[in-house]
Amino acid sequence: MKGIQITPIALLVVNTISMSSAYADIPVTCHTTGTSESDLFCGSVSNTNGAVKSLAIGNNAFIPKAIIPGKTGIEQAIAIGSNVQATGDNSLVIGNDAITGKTGSVAIGGDDAAGTYHANGKGYILRAAGSNSVDNNLTNFRANAAIGNGAVSLGANSQALSDGAVSIGAAATAGAGTQNGTTWNSTSGRQSIAVGAESSALQDNSIALGYRSEATGNSSTAIGNNASAKNNNALAMGREASATGEQSIALGMNSGAEGSDALALGNSAHADAAGAILIGRDAKNTKDTLSAVGLPADNGINAIGIGSSVRSAANGIAIGRGAEAKISEATTIAIGNGAVSAGGIAIGQGASVVKGNNPSGTASASVSVGRQTVVADYGVALGSRASVGITLTDDGNPERVTTGGLYGTAVGINSGVYSNSALAVGHNAKVSENANAALAIGYNSLSSAQNAIAIGKGAKASADNTISIGTGNIVSGTNSGAIGDPSTVSGVNSYSIGNNNIISASNAFVLGNAVNNAVDNSVVLGNDSTVSAAISTPGYSVNGVSHKFAGSSPISTVSIGDSGKERTLTNVAAGRLSPVSTDAINGSQLFAVTSEVEKGNLFAGNTGTFNRRLGETTTIRGG
């Protein structure tokens, strides 16, 4: 046996290992082999087996023979502790029941088995021989091990089982493989990193950081206590975060990304379908909530959700606290706190697109923009509390679905459309039910009948085909209209143009202001004009001679003034002169008649001639 110099530090290590081991009562003896170069083994049953420049200190400390043909022994290996093995060149193992496997590997720590054992079943053993390969084969036993080129294992029961693997922490595991007898075959986990008690990084380039964190996919990363990344390129960050889809990302406590390419960001956020993006606390992608009406159910593929407690179906977008995209359509977008979309676009706090009377069960192509706006069935609502196809309560919540609203448009605060193909524009402008194709424009305007038009502040058109244009006009007669400031038309087929007019007659027309027309079929022209029923004039007697007039049975009259407020009728064309003519006669025609009358009669006698006009006296004497 060759002599070898034992430094004070080496003696301290030897003494410490001896005193801390189960064999503290056994004297420590150091030896060198006769065939090795500067190798040293100290302790009961320790052995360097011909290793070169190697050191084995402790009970059952073991450096095996070289397994490469032509190689003398393991070079520059160090094994310190009870039941330890350094089986690779330049490897280092420190602790009880620890193992290093390949070149440059490091294992520091020990197992947690109670009692004193000698076993070749202590975890993973590369090549045991001689006295080190006998005794009990234990079950449920885990040794500290660094098996792989450049592997590093630090901590009790820590294991680094592949090339470049790093495990730090009690029972941490980096890499995986299979054991055939006393030979370990690494299958995965190259360059893997596991840091934290009971953490595990089992696939190539995987990283697990945190207590019981788990990275089991290639290039996967799990950071946080109980975090898990279980698919290739998955990332889970946060306590109990879970990323199980390929390329999925889960960030936040209890977050989960189960779909491929899914993103869940926020505490308890979940993206459970492929391509889903959910951002915010408790954000979730959901199945089609209206699948019961025949739409295909799905699990939120390509859904996007951003905000606390958001919900998004497949292809939907939900952004904002409590926002929800219910239907799996590309046009399903809900943006804003509490926004809800069942197939269209809802933007604004509490904005919603909901199913109305549409048999398909969706509100596809609907748009709702503004706080508490509501749209049902292919409508458009713009403005706070604007609504189409559904009425609202006083506090702005949906009340009931109306009989109409398809293709309706409401623009303005509190505007509403409750009939098909109708339009309401302005604050509190409304088109009520049973008023298809109606129009209401202006503050407090209202159209409540088919094809009705109300334009102006407070304008109201309440009968079919009516027109009310101007402030405060009220038109309730079918096919009637009013243009101007507050006028009222209740007659059928009647029109008022002007201000402050009242027409209760049917088929009547007023052009002027402050006119009250109650005469059917009449026409009133001018400010403050009045009208009364027409009086028939069948004929007239002159000097006892009766004359009958044409047009002696009028159905109504035209008024252009009032008593004391008469008006001339100017620029009247010459009317026809005949026994049956009903044309108006202008001044020139009357002038022609009077001119002839004023010429008088020419009389001739034996004494001469003379002229007498109508009404003049002519005296005739006998000769």
Regions found by a protein language model. Name each.
Residues 1-623:
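Primarily extracellular Gram-negative trimeric autotransporter adhesin
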